[in-house]
Amino acid sequence: MADVAKFLDRVEGSLNRGREIDRILSSFKLNAYDVLDILPGMSVDDIRNLYRKKSLMIHPDKNRDNPKAADAFDILKKAESDLVNDKIRESLDSAYTAARNQLLKEKKLSPNSEDVHSDQFLFDLKVRWREILIADEVARRRARQLDLANQQREQARQDEIARERKRRVESEKVWEETRDNRVGNWQDFLHKTKKNNLKKKNKKPRVLG
């Protein structure tokens, strides 16, 4: 009987681990709170403790028969890293507060209203929170693309300046290298011109008649 109980415990544990793995994989990856299935308000130490429990639960070594365990573990690890990062956590908290305030205003509820603690309000809050985070991510990506485009244009401008400088240096180099030839040609031209002028000057005019 004891063996049966142990077997059932193992089956239940395996099912729970599988459900947690699937939950993590289907969570909203831009929101580390959603990955850990918590809301803002927990201390960093509590977040770390929760992460340790969940990571042990879904660790690939304990779920060798589940090929999705490794991906879920990586996602969970990143979420924990995000939430112990003050800047990222504060950004998520700010989006959460904005979503909550928007809903309170739209639904004309006070922060102490019983409806604020209802499942429906929590569902709506998570949806609005998600929308805000998506909008923020889109804005960040556009800003990065714009910054990249500006960098590429500046790089192209600098490259053109460098090419023009190189052309000018090469042109000046050729000019210097051909100086002697130009001087020689000019002297030859002057000498030839002078010689022709002397010929014309010494040439007797033809007598008509």
Curated annotation (Swiss-Prot):
A Pfam family recorded for this sequence: DnaJ
Gene that encodes the chain: spf31
Biased composition (Basic residues): 192-209
Residue ranges constituting the J domain according to the UniProt record: 31-96
SMART domains: DnaJ
Molecular function terms, GO-annotated: Hsp70 protein binding
Basic and acidic residues compositional bias, start-end: 154-175
Stretch list, region Disordered: 149-175, 187-209
GO CC, one annotated term: nucleus
BP GO annotations: mRNA cis splicing, via spliceosome
Lineage of producing organism: Eukaryota, Fungi, Dikarya, Ascomycota, Taphrinomycotina
Keywords on record: Chaperone
Name by which UniProt lists this protein: J domain-containing protein spf31
Organism of provenance: Schizosaccharomyces pombe (strain 972 / ATCC 24843)
